[in-house]
């Protein structure tokens, strides 16, 4: 299976309006597990299937260099800190605001 390259943070899906965010930023925020996040699978889209998979939450590893994206179907995927997934535009704006507060 080819390695999935992340979309750049801030990329807006033209079909859904969902916004790409860093998985790490979501994991470090209060939105983790509360705001719906979506994983995009380009292979599924190529096969004519629904490419969106609902994310239930993100569990950071203790070393901090990787994390498990946990899906609503009970499966999970380990990713690095630069991987992105998608939030609604409203939740992406909330995440950006929370990230800005942490940096102040």
Swiss-Prot record:
Pfam families: DUF2761. Keywords: Plasmid. InterPro entries: DUF2761 (IPR024249). This is Protein KleF.
């Amino acid at each position: 299976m080819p390695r999935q390259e992340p979309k750049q943070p801030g990329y807006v899906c033209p079909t859904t309006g969902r916004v790409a965010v860093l998985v790490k930023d979501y994991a470090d925020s209060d939105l983790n597990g509360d705001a719906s996040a979506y994983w995009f699978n380009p292979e599924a889209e190529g096969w004519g299937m629904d490419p969106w998979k609902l994310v239930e939450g993100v569990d950071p590893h203790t070393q901090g260099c990787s994390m498990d994206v946990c899906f609503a179907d009970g499966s999970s995927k380990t990713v690095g800190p630069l991987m992105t997934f998608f939030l609604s535009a409203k939740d992406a704006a909330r995440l950006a605001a929370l990230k800005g507060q942490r940096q102040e």
